[in-house]
């Protein structure tokens, strides 16, 4: 058990009990002009900072944003069979015809899968470029239509000003796809700054505070059949993961039988892994308060490390009520958009762990602010693991008391960075700190079968 993290979460629970005694083909063509398509020539050279003859960065030049490009890459990868078919409870569970179907094992053997990914590239007048991704295709449309015209000509180094201006530029900017688009731009601008100063982003943020970032194994997509769970859980433990998160397969629509399967999953994991591995669970907003509390009361004896998104994130009072009513820590935040939402939850005593995502919540800049807000309440921030680049740099730059751990989606990350030549690698449940400038994302031309680049100066 990680005694520091355990202490953080347990102390936050003690504090709230005294303080509150009663209480997811890319249509960018219509949004911009296509300037390049098909082939891999655009990435024949690695993005690198421009340098003077004395090999020092051109720090005296302004970094005006000249071009914003959205690049969709296409290729293929080989997928391990039998790991992408597990049902996961979700808010649609209440509808019989929309409820996730039970898992069925796929045929043995691997298969070839077509894939695509979108990256954002910003070019500046100083010759320095920033690259970030993969980003959500739907958010890329917002970058293309709404943010690009606003950003062209602005100073890429003026991070605080640009974030605030993007946020104020549209009445819909406070959440959803617009905030996800702000996140993509913000992260790309941090990459530019790191390349400009020739240091990793975590150094710009004040780090490092450690030499590597510990990750927990997030088991989305794996079979929930008992023997498969035992096999997978033990394999992850042997790989060094001291924390494992599993995803609930059933909700209220599956009745008592589904509830017992959810409870059985907890029992199997605790008995399989013993007391030296923490187990966490995610309900992906597919339960309601009563269902969550019934489950909690049945599994408290197995000491889950947290239950995540037990109900819809809009229901702050339900989260607060659950936190008052069970010893199991309450986690949420992947669908938080900005520090204001986090503060409302924390003021209500509704969370033991904040899980904001730097790809969605407002980028690197906003997750740092969220960390400050959470630290005022002695609540740890463990970023949602939709992506790794920004999260690893942020975690490693901040106090372990505030950012103790990261999420590693074991299944997803096997292919999510398919087009990158230097993806972040987990070794013994840790990711070593990158040493290149910025986020140091490099694309592999050999893996890009075709591409489409949309840009408008």
Feature roles, as predicted:
Residues 127, 185, 198, 307, ...:
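Conserved, mostly hydrophobic/aromatic
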Residues 84, 106-108, 123-196:
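Metal- or metallocofactor-binding catalytic centers and their adjacent structured scaffolds
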Residues 1-22:
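N-terminal secretory signal peptides
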